[in-house]
């Protein structure tokens, strides 16, 4: 079931990326990334509250961010997240 949800989220992300044209304006390239809107920490929980084999120490230390433009170095895309009507990439390390 989790695999189906993850695959459908990836398909939706692919459609979203293809639907939105990439706009590279001078304003976007000159401004530095500012924390806040782009870098939002997300709490990630795996398994049930009583605990499961998925809740190992390495998974509890997982830190994820919702990012607009893609994952940073040492992060990998782990799905998508939504804020309002906008869809972001869920980048975890």
UniProtKB/Swiss-Prot annotation:
Q: Which PROSITE patterns match?
A: DEFENSIN
Covalent S-S links between cysteines: 64-92, 66-81, 71-91
Q: Which Pfam families match?
A: Defensin_1, Defensin_propep
Keywords annotated in UniProt:
Antibiotic, Antimicrobial, Defensin, Disulfide bond, Secreted, Signal
Q: Does the keyword Signal apply?
A: yes
Instruction: List the subcellular locations.
Output: Secreted
Q: Which SUPFAM superfamilies match?
A: Defensin-like
The organs and tissues expressing this protein are described as: Paneth cells of the small bowel.
A Gene Ontology BP annotation from the UniProt entry: defense response to bacterium
Q: GO CC terms for this protein?
A: extracellular space
Q: What does this protein do?
A: Probably contributes to the antimicrobial barrier function of the small bowel mucosa.
PANTHER family attached to this UniProt entry: ALPHA-DEFENSIN 1 (PTHR11876), ALPHA-DEFENSIN 1-RELATED (PTHR11876:SF2)
Which family, according to the similarity comment? Belongs to the alpha-defensin family.
Q: What's the name of the protein?
A: Alpha-defensin 9
């Amino acid at each position: 079931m989790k695999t189906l949800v993850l695959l459908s989220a990836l398909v939706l992300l692919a459609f979203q990326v293809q639907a939105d044209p990439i706009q590279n304006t001078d304003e976007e390239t000159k401004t530095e990334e500012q924390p806040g809107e782009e870098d939002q920490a997300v709490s990630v929980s795996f398994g049930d509250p009583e605990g499961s084999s998925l809740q190992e120490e390495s998974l509890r230390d997982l830190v994820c961010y919702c990012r607009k433009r893609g994952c940073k170095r040492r992060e990998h895309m782990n799905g998508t997240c939504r804020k309002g009507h906008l869809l972001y990439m869920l980048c975890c390390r």
